Each structure stands twice: as structure tokens, then as C-alpha cells.
Amino acid sequence: MRIGATLLLRNQNCVQSYSWSNIRPLGSLQIAMDSLEEYECDEVSIIRPVRAKDSIESFSKDIEAIRLIKTMTPISFGGGIRTLEHLELLRDLPVERLIFSSSFITKNKKLINKAKNLYGQQAIQCLLPIKIIDQKIFVYYCNEAKLISINKLDLSFINNFANEVVLYDISNDGLRDSFNEQIADSLSYDYPKLVLSGGIGKETIKWARKKGFASVLVDNKALHREYSINEYKNA
């Protein structure tokens, strides 16, 4: 099982997120990547935490920041890849995987197929930001900045077009050892297809490794030495 980290990128700099809403400045993207490489992180997912409104200008500036990164750590990128124009801007970007969220919710087959043709099926990830309310599962639909019932999603479409599905527990974003196991157990996907994020800690990793999940992504804590990736690898 891979043990990676999530970095949130806003205005070309990293930010910390708590409970999917509280944002705090973190600093330089390169410095964050250097720290994660030092901690022997298996992979890094760089995500732009965009909500309903975004612009090509903002997207382009963030892309250029990623293009300048110097690292040997495999990178996944997502956040705001909504059109073929966005996809075209990613050419020659030093990333191994692309992360789509709203495009899977709206079943934008044209965009996802184009990405698959350019990068390969193995490069396509679907991000589902999930929140459980009164035992019901909701997914955050970033394009419209609102929660929708998971029943509105075509899970078969996601299964067919995504190589991996990232389950992001947004209620426990920024916390430790609090990932809601019900999220993974409630979906009909095989564990080796799933990546877990939000509320990841040592005990979560032990459980995830035993179950056979593909990967876990530690959030903000991974940049603090006391919560470094090496600590989690020894869980």
C-alpha cells in the first residue's frame, strides 16, 4: 500500500485545510515538496481547492507553479480541470496522474476520454469528497459548491473510467485517526481501487493496510516532522 500526502494549492502557494472549509496559509510549494521528499513520501496529490468559481487565469498560474517544481516524487494533480482548454494547459506538466471530481459527477465522457487518450487509463483518478449526515452519504459537487446525494452519481461510470477512486472524508479533513470507515464500506468498489484521505493516522493506516486499499493520503500533518511519512510507514 502506498503512503502519500495531499497538498492544497491556492494562488501558487500551499494552504492548510480543516473540515473542508477553514483555510490557513502554509507556504511555498517547492519547500513543501522538498519536505515530503525528505520524508520519503510515496506520492503527492496536489489539489486546487476550487469551489463554484474559477478562472483560466488562476488555473494557468497554478499550473506554472507546478511546472517549476523540482522533485523525484510522483505527483497527481487535480482541481478545476473542467474543459478541454484546461486539459490542454497540462501538456508537459511533470505529473503522473490526473484527478477529476465534478467531471465524473456530470459524466463528462468527452473530457475524461481525452485525458485517458493523452495520459493512459492508469493515470485517471476520481476524487469524491464525502460527508455522512444522519447515516446518509453525500458528495461535495465542487462546480456548484454544494452537497448532493451519492445516489445521484453513476458509480458504474466512475468504476469504468477511473483507475482509482479517492475517497476524501471532508468531515475529518485535517484531523488524525478519524477517517470514517463507513465511507469505504458503503461503496461497491474493490478496496485495491480505493485511495483514502481525510483523518488519516497510524491506526487508520493499519486498518487500510490490512484491508488492502491502494493508498492513503495524509493531509496537512505530513509537513510536520512529528507526523512525518516515515512515522506512518512504520505503523
For each of these PLM feature ranges, what is it?
Residues 8-22, 91, 95-173:
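Conserved anion-binding
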